Regions:
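A generic membrane alpha-helix/interface feature
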Residues: 23, 60, 89, 109-111, ...
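CN hydrolase (nitrilase-like) catalytic-core segments centered on the catalytic cysteine
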Residues: 2-87
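Cysteine/selenocysteine-centered motifs that mediate thiol-based redox chemistry or coordinate metal-sulfur cofactors
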Residues: 3, 97-125
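A sequence-level detector of short, solvent-exposed, charge-rich linear segments
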Residues: 16, 20, 53, 57, ...
């Protein structure tokens, strides 16, 4: 998305407890995965997540919230709680993000023309 001009990544999610193991809390892993997108692409991430409990006939699922905003290097600059609806505000500098992408080799030296084989199941271009 960044290669196509995106300046922010928005991730609306509905992630929470695992019905098979209600003691398992994946919220830290979920945040690290989203933060990895921010750091590797030098782009701010805004990740929203549901809160509360949803009850079905034979199942109940808990959504752990913890929505957050990162800056362009993956630092969390705002984070929500687990149990209440909130509006998060974070100050993001898009020009700093663009400058870093042009300077730091992780993004600058990408060669997307070589990725074509990854787009097909058989690896052909």
């Amino acid at each position: 998305m960044v290669l196509n001009g995106a300046e922010l990544l928005l991730y609306p999610t509905a992630i929470g407890g695992e019905p098979e193991d209600d003691g398992f809390d994946s919220s830290d892993m979920w945040q690290r995965a989203m933060i990895g997108h921010s750091a590797s692409k030098q782009i701010p991430v805004i990740a929203s997540n549901r809160i509360g409990t949803e009850k079905g006939i034979d199942i109940e699922n808990y959504f752990y919230g913890r929505s957050f905003v990162t800056n362009h290097v993956g630092d969390k600059i705002a984070e929500g709680s687990r149990d209440k609806e909130e509006v998060l505000i974070g100050k993001i500098n898009l020009s700093e993000a663009e400058t870093l992408r042009n300077v730091w080799g992780v993004f600058r030296d990408r060669r997307p023309e070589l990725y074509k084989g990854l787009l097909n199941l058989d690896g052909s271009e």
